[in-house]
Amino acid sequence: AEPRQPLALVLVPTRELAQQVTDALTPYARSVRLRLATVVGGMPIGRQASALRGGAEVVVATPGRLKDLIDRGDCRLNQVAITVLD
């Protein structure tokens, strides 16, 4: 994926659920060489922004942190082809 432009978005309501989804997706992502980023509140935003700049194809996010990253210009959703709302 292009920097800051994920191809898939999984939007979840809580940090805990984001971690569970990330844990479940990680083996699949590794097997097909997809970069996965988890963006949630309560964690350093800089590290999460770096993962997006690195070209993560799949993003698991909570709404508030995703909005923060969009507002900062660290994430653009115009290339997202798959969205999962949980």
Predicted ranges, named:
Residues 1-86:
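SF2 DExD/H RNA helicase N-terminal ATP-binding lobe
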